[in-house]
Amino acid sequence: MEAIFELLGYQYKASLNWDIYIPLLKGYNKGKNIFIKKILFIKNNGLIINGFPYINRGIIKAKIIKHIRDKKQICFKSKKRKGFKLKKGHRQYLTKIKIIYIEF
């Protein structure tokens, strides 16, 4: 069973027991269950259900595994012939979730 859902303005593809990295969910602790109701698409053994825009009775249950930081993204600027160099780094906060079940 596969599903496409929307969370925090982004769309994700999920299947049972998948681990997915999403932007940080503030206020949720490790081990807590979350319920996702904005499901766009479900595919189950040849049966395809498409929402307009969302599936009304669909729920995805996921468990928060941990909060982590992504690898460093480097932004480097320079100007030719001036000797100007600027190096900045950024690490995005992420939440790792595990899909427990998909119901429709």
From Swiss-Prot:
UniProt-listed Pfam families: Ribosomal_L21p (PF00829)
Keyword Ribonucleoprotein: yes
Record-level GO cellular component terms: cytoplasm; ribonucleoprotein complex; ribosome
Entry keyword annotation includes Magnesium: no
GO BP term, pick one: translation
Keywords: Ribonucleoprotein, Ribosomal protein, RNA-binding, rRNA-binding
Gene Ontology MF, one: structural constituent of ribosome
Family, similarity comment: Belongs to the bacterial ribosomal protein bL21 family.
Complex formation: Part of the 50S ribosomal subunit. Contacts protein L20.
HAMAP family in the cross-refs: Ribosomal_bL21
Described function: This protein binds to 23S rRNA in the presence of protein L20.
Name by which UniProt lists this protein: Large ribosomal subunit protein bL21
